[in-house]
């Protein structure tokens, strides 16, 4: 019987919390807010895509019902929702080539899953070659000004190394144990690197999103390589410090991050519409933390997760197909 990997559940909880917190922090300003926001965006999505790769297995039904189906569904839902709350006439347009805001994650994951049969090798040298190739592609993609939000192609290349690394890490069956001195040195490096990210005028929010070319975001391949390296450094650090034991309440919520991720956007859009972050910076941050944790507790509970899975991941279609066969 497969043993539950609570370390990964705990890490997913932390990352989904940072996703929500980051989205709420976009809605207000402040020096600390700006600095913390940049630190979050330097690693939280690289780590999320690493975990996505870690748990990735190619199944046609999973691809269609677990990824393509919810992408189409929520692309429609969010377009209608935005049209209703932001357009006085209630009009909206629906198209699927350019994902709506947070749905870029689903679209690039669909593309990554399509690559899995090509990535499926147990040869260590081949794995290393593929990871290095993906890093080179991520660096070269920054020169192409045609890559952007359409098809999430810019992000596809930007986060590809993390997904592939996660996929191969799962196959290596590592225990994520590192010497204490190594983690100490890595922690110092992360502090220095984070200070550089905060103070560097070249590393803007656009750069951290992974959606813009070097020309459009005014940076270069050197900074891109630095950010890729930093993303991997954060992943190693987090895999060491996150507890491997079950943490009451948190571990369970970490198992149900898809529902939280896809549904929280509606709340964020309403928060922006009604400008609920209208206090001092410190009060806004506290409000954002409490709101993020409350949403995770609400949307990540087992009951919501069960019904979300039934309705929005195509499991009901799978159930009907099984009945007919």
Task: Please give the residue ranges for each predicted region.
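Alpha-helical transmembrane segments and their immediate juxtamembrane cytosolic regions
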Residues: 1-325
